[in-house]
């Protein structure tokens, strides 16, 4: 069932046909492209949206589809990464093809135990995303997960998280990012720029829900 959901989500997001034309920012263990779509006013500070980092949590692809198609407000600049883990997404698995959890592989207290990888940034996917983030310096980053149905974080930008929660209809929960998480690294690297997690509920999300969350992204992206 999960594989069917992923195939449908990939088709809906247009990745199968559109990915070859998108800018490639890196490659996975198995050689799949990691792509990023740019939209909007390039003179404005960018918002980065990552639809999938755990391959068994594909609902963020529906959000990416909405953000690729919706009209943008003036002065909004988006970078959209459908998946940071294309091998895991193709297999319907949380980890990448090396069995590493890419959201425990960042240089932010990475424990080097379990599935966090042998060392920080040991994986080509996390290494590619780190390089991309350092290059574009996003003013705001949102990473999508499943299935907890909440917005969480604990950084100084709680007002931003609560605003997203209010606009999306999801509850906010104060929660520290785990060791080795991407948002934990980003908050250290760019302390003035919010980076947080949105958890969709389990299973596919409706078009209306994806659109509501996309509108929340745009609202937070307006300067």
How would you label these PLM feature ranges?
Residues 27-29, 44-53, 57-68, 72-177, ...:
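Active-site/substrate-binding loop(s) of hydrolase catalytic cores
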Residues 2-35:
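Short glycine- and acidic-rich boundary segments immediately preceding or forming the N-terminal edge
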Residues 35-44:
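Short beta-strand-to-loop junctions in surface cap/lid or active-site-entrance loops
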